[in-house]
């Protein structure tokens, strides 16, 4: 039995609590990704989270909590994605979504490439690059990150990836009013969504930032 299999029920319950309809086979792929993350983490130090139940809550369910707010997004860039979060779970659940995952640390990008191969994620492309140097062939209608400590940095480094009508999606803890006040000119918070992540006893918010 795999390490995460005993927690498959917790994942299923969390998905139901989020109001999401994800097939059992797709949930099994999410578990398989979590297994890979735990396995590679022993050598590569991809995440500080090592407890299987926390992989379910802090990584998988936390990533899936943003799904309802990305329904209009077709091409998504995940910036500073580390072990592929939230990009890989989103790519697993939405196979029609094109996901570009940008990570500066080579070993983390290498893990993402291995996960892409093992999980057969044709819609997921990891890039070992700095986001400010990235020049995609076509703009993204969504750019997401849960890595940036500052909204200002997120906008200044990643804003050039956003196409007309697109937006930046910042996954944060407590709503960062001071960071919102420091946003660069020409950018505004279009919406703030509180995220109730099942099993996670912490405030989470998704801020949608767009030009205007």
UniProtKB/Swiss-Prot annotation:
User: How is this protein annotated for GO cellular component?
Assistant: cytosol
Q: What class of enzyme is it?
A: transferase
Is the Glycoprotein keyword given for this protein? no
- Check the record and name the InterPro entries matching this protein: rRNA_ssu_MeTfrase_G (IPR003682), SAM-dependent_MTases_sf (IPR029063)
Positions with a binding annotation for S-adenosyl-L-methionine: 80, 85, 131-132, 146
**Catalysed reaction equations from the record:** guanosine(527) in 16S rRNA + S-adenosyl-L-methionine = N(7)-methylguanosine(527) in 16S rRNA + S-adenosyl-L-homocysteine
* Entry EC no(s): 2.1.1.170
The UniProt keywords, alphabetically, are: Cytoplasm, Methyltransferase, rRNA processing, S-adenosyl-L-methionine, Transferase
Molecular-function GO terms, alphabetical: rRNA (guanine-N7-)-methyltransferase activity
| Cited Pfam families | GidB
Location of this chain's protein in the cell: Cytoplasm
User: What Gene3D superfamilies does the record point to?
Assistant: Vaccinia Virus protein VP39
Role description: Specifically methylates the N7 position of guanine in position 527 of 16S rRNA.
PANTHER family, A to Z: S-ADENOSYL-L-METHIONINE-DEPENDENT METHYLTRANSFERASES SUPERFAMILY PROTEIN
Q: Which family does it belong to?
A: Belongs to the methyltransferase superfamily. RNA methyltransferase RsmG family.
**Name of the featured protein:** Ribosomal RNA small subunit methyltransferase G
